[in-house]
């Protein structure tokens, strides 16, 4: 069983929701990144590790800034895989990266490396559902979950995608990029309600979730909460503030 499936089953039995925490690999520096990753990993249920890219179209200002800084650290994909192998324990890890990085390594080799080094899932935000077949086939071959991103723009399209989704369905809480500072779009509640009619795959929500209040609103309808930009901001403020934030979110999930 994929570790993501196992984790969501465990949480369901306990009546808990998944804390899915994101950070950018290589941030804030090449030397410090593993310490921060281990710290975040100790609080979350699922770790989402972003691999930096020069044109991250789905990412907002905060994660773009983290990616730019990480790229200056001369971060390589091999560094990411070796680090996962080094620190991973009993909780799942998802890699978030852009398609060009996968193509550069080769689709077959990339997903075999995911299996061999311990990545449980992959999120590729610039590949549409219609373009994902080759990636999903490689995932199945290696026991890795391909996580579908679903937006609030079309409920019927979202339902079509969710019917075949694996691991968890990543539901975007609003139109736009990560870290958006506005209010959560209320149509996310309708979307989640409709998706539950067509899939038993866990539903996770993300993009712009930044506070305990946001989490409390969404945890009643979602199976998991994804937080990224807010974690990056707390890294900038220092480990004490980061730990306080992680503890706060952990306490309400």
Swiss-Prot record:
Catalytic site positions: 48 (proton acceptor), 59 (proton acceptor)
InterPro entries: Aldolase_TIM, RibuloseP-bd_barrel, Trp_synthase_alpha_AS, Trp_synthase_suA
Any one GO MF annotation of this record: tryptophan synthase activity
Record keywords: Amino-acid biosynthesis, Aromatic amino acid biosynthesis, Lyase, Tryptophan biosynthesis
Pathway stated in the Swiss-Prot or TrEMBL entry: Amino-acid biosynthesis; L-tryptophan biosynthesis; L-tryptophan from chorismate: step 5/5
CC annotations in GO: cytosol
Short name of any one Pfam family annotated for the protein: Trp_syntA
Catalysis: reaction(s): (1S,2R)-1-C-(indol-3-yl)glycerol 3-phosphate + L-serine = D-glyceraldehyde 3-phosphate + L-tryptophan + H2O
EC number: 4.2.1.20
Domain of life: Bacteria
Class of the enzyme per the UniProt entry, highest EC level: lyase
Keyword Lyase tagged: yes
Function of the protein: The alpha subunit is responsible for the aldol cleavage of indoleglycerol phosphate to indole and glyceraldehyde 3-phosphate.
Similarity field: Belongs to the TrpA family.
Assembly with partners or alone: Tetramer of two alpha and two beta chains.
PANTHER family attached to this UniProt entry: TRYPTOPHAN SYNTHASE ALPHA CHAIN, CHLOROPLASTIC (PTHR43406:SF1), TRYPTOPHAN SYNTHASE, ALPHA CHAIN (PTHR43406)
The protein, known as: Tryptophan synthase alpha chain
Organism: Caldicellulosiruptor saccharolyticus (strain ATCC 43494 / DSM 8903 / Tp8T 6331)
